[in-house]
Amino acid sequence: MIDSYKFGEFVVQGKKFKSNITLIGDKVKEHRHLQNHELSLDDFTELVNAKPEIIIIGTGAYGVVKPPKEIIEFLEKQGIKVIVEKTGSACKTYNSLLKQGKKVAALMHNTC
């Protein structure tokens, strides 16, 4: 569960992260691959390998990160539902889906 999010910082299970993060179920890791607000398929390898029902992409506090259409299409062809939201909303959606018992993963951008 994501305890909180504010610009530049996540708190997950009581631990602070001042970087982008990936989440798979209740596991969290720093994600340092995202460069210049651009996503690539490589950013999603570990998430796809976990075989989630849903992947949430947190696009930053102001929604600056824009996932390319090709990435969304690739994920959907894998049978994965994709939700793209500003990071604050994406955190709430992640927690809600996790509470519902969904197999969910996420990539969350921590700043703009």
Where do the language-model regions lie?
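C-terminal structural segments of small proteins and small subunits
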Residues: 81-109
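Non-catalytic interface/targeting segments
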Residues: 1-41, 98-112
